[in-house]
């Protein structure tokens, strides 16, 4: 396998740039650059030179022999000055060395997976953690990247193995005419594990956390949707005009309130009729956004919004109007009245829609595998042929193996590690 290298720190210019090298030629590359290799896992100052002996930079270098490191292979880290020219010169020199090449996106992490340093669930958690933008996302995804989810699944797998051992024992000590019954405790254990998996299947998934709670602003034209949208974003993201129908498309913006992620969605004004084909497309898109919404803020006439929509009286600063009799909130985007209360209510509602801080969450792929395992356990019944019971347990165990990557496909791995940046 070729030795790979890449810049693992932020894009230059920066105070420090960290270049990683991983593979069998890592030690030789360090020796060629620095003239000597320092003691393992001890930082040392070295002058780096190119193949002609010209100085590239003075850097702190680390020699990290495998397998007890990030990738499980021999590794080197070069902590150099973070200027563009310095980084480019060092990478250019590395590229001329036999057996070395630039790393592909996610290739360091993929090698860590291949060498057993992390499992698939940890890799998926790390991929999501790299794109975490809010505190809640960081807390939940850190738990998955740190191995808590893998420990949990490993425990479930061990329980299935123990159940399989009981079935195999019963098969070994039975004859063709008199198959021994499994103990009642066996079925209790199966039911308990199935219920535990079922509880996990009810929890919010990572995708919901990644995208945030979808909040749609809906109502007729000129109801104040875009004004409220801008007020919550604290920016002029949407055009606001007294002309009805100014907003003709769906406008989405991510935002975090107190570390909780949301996606705010402004929509075209809803009304019947109209000969403008572009406006009709905007209305159709608005209705589609309503179908996918977690929360709808209804700024139209009271009682005319979708079921479970929040009735918002968004023009509390205007005297000549027909006020809603029982709105959830009265507010004014112009004066700021009620905006803080709306944000508090949104955050409170999000607690039931998103994983809680410190929780472990699964993604759609992992959810499907847990569902498969739970379904197999649910098929196990008293009096069932023991060979059928054994097959249900084997399939459940296979689902757990695919969860952590004991069994997987190259296409799925390509898709996962392709999400990483170069150098990770």
From Swiss-Prot:
Its main location: cytoplasm. K(+) binds at residues 222, 241, 243, 246. The keyword Magnesium applies. Mg(2+) binds at residues 226, 247. InterPro entries: G_TrmE (IPR031168), GTP-bd (IPR006073), GTP-bd_TrmE_N (IPR018948), GTPase_MnmE (IPR004520), MnmE_dom2 (IPR027368), MnmE_helical (IPR025867), P-loop_NTPase (IPR027417), Small_GTP-bd (IPR005225). It holds the Pfam family MMR_HSR1. Coiled coil: none annotated. Binds 1 potassium ion per subunit. It comes from Erythrobacter litoralis (strain HTCC2594). One of its GO terms (biological process) is tRNA wobble uridine modification. It comes from the Bacteria. It is found in: Cytoplasm. Homodimer. Heterotetramer of two MnmE and two MnmG subunits. NCBIfam families: PRK05291.1-3, small_GTP. This is tRNA modification GTPase MnmE. Its EC number is 3.6.-.-. Residues 212-351 form the TrmE-type G domain. (6S)-5-formyl-5,6,7,8-tetrahydrofolate binds at residues 20, 77, 117, 424. One of its GO terms (cellular component) is cytoplasm. Exhibits a very high intrinsic GTPase hydrolysis rate. Involved in the addition of a carboxymethylaminomethyl (cmnm) group at the wobble position (U34) of certain tRNAs, forming tRNA-cmnm(5)s(2)U34. PROSITE patterns: G_TRME (PS51709).
